[in-house]
C-alpha cells in the first residue's frame, strides 16, 4: 500500500485529490497539509466520511512526513510554496507529484537538482489530464506538417487563476517549438505589433472556466483549430493519483505525464 500525503488539502484541487485517493485500492492517505483549518479531519474538505487524518500545519511538513512514513507527496499549490516544500520532501526521501504551475526557470532548476541529489522520483507536469497530454501529442504532429502556418494559442481559465499564461499553454508552445526547431513566444499583443514567425499566446480569465486550450494553425484561406476543454477538475485529480501510483514503481529520476501514459 502506497502512503500518500497531500499539500493544499483544503483547497479545490487538494480536496479532489484526497477524494480520489480514498477510491484507490493501492494507496492510502496518511497526511494532509494546509496553512489553515489545522486539526480538522481531511475528509471534511473532500466531502467523504471522516478519514481519521487531521490537517497538519505545513510548517510541520518534515516532521509529519517522517512520522507517517509517507511514500509520495502530491503538490498542487503555488510556486512560492512548492519551491520551499519540494526540497523538504525530497530531503525526507519522499517521492513527488508536482502539478504547481508558474514556477520560474530558476525555481524549477532548484527543484530538479534537489530531486536528483536525494535520488527520489518525481512527476512534474503542468497538466495531469489524460486528454490534455494526448492533445500535446496531436499538436506536436500537426506542427510538423504546418510549419509555414501562423500559430496562435488561446487559453481560458477561471477568474481566480494566479498565473498567466497557463502552464498548459506554455507546454503546448514548447511542444510546437521543439517540433519546429525553436520558436519565439509572444504573450499578447498591443499597439503596433507586426506579426513575425513567433508563437502567439493569449490568456482569458473569467467566471468559473475550468480550462480551455486552443491551438490555431492559420494559413491563407484556411485554418485548423485543435482544442481541449476541461469540464471538471476531477480529470486533474484522477491523473495525479494515477501518476502517484505509477511513480513509486520507477527508478529515481524526473518524469512527465508522457512517461506515465506511455505516450
Curated annotation (Swiss-Prot):
In what pathway does it function?
A: Amino-acid biosynthesis; L-lysine biosynthesis via DAP pathway; (S)-tetrahydrodipicolinate from L-aspartate: step 4/4
> Per the UniProt record, which EC number(s) apply here?
1.17.1.8
CDD domains for this protein: DHDPR_N
Which EC class does it fall in?
A: oxidoreductase
**A Gene Ontology cellular-component term:** cytoplasm
Please tell me where NAD(+) binds in this chain.
8-13, 34, 99-101, 125-128
Give binding positions for (S)-2,3,4,5-tetrahydrodipicolinate.
158, 167-168
Q: Which SUPFAM superfamilies match?
A: Glyceraldehyde-3-phosphate dehydrogenase-like, C-terminal domain, NAD(P)-binding Rossmann-fold domains
Task: Enumerate the catalysed reactions.
Answer: (S)-2,3,4,5-tetrahydrodipicolinate + NAD(+) + H2O = (2S,4S)-4-hydroxy-2,3,4,5-tetrahydrodipicolinate + NADH + H(+); (S)-2,3,4,5-tetrahydrodipicolinate + NADP(+) + H2O = (2S,4S)-4-hydroxy-2,3,4,5-tetrahydrodipicolinate + NADPH + H(+)
Q: Where in the cell is it found?
A: Cytoplasm
One family name in Pfam for this protein: DapB_C
**Which BP terms in the Gene Ontology apply to this protein?**
diaminopimelate biosynthetic process; lysine biosynthetic process via diaminopimelate
Arranged from A to Z, the UniProt key words for this protein are:
Amino-acid biosynthesis, Cytoplasm, Diaminopimelate biosynthesis, Lysine biosynthesis, NAD, NADP, Oxidoreductase
This protein's major location comes to: cytoplasm
Single GO MF descriptor: NAD binding
What does the record give as the active site?
Answer: 157 (proton donor/acceptor), 161 (proton donor)
What this chain does, per the record? Catalyzes the conversion of 4-hydroxy-tetrahydrodipicolinate (HTPA) to tetrahydrodipicolinate.
The entry's family comment says:
Belongs to the DapB family.
Q: What is this protein called?
A: 4-hydroxy-tetrahydrodipicolinate reductase
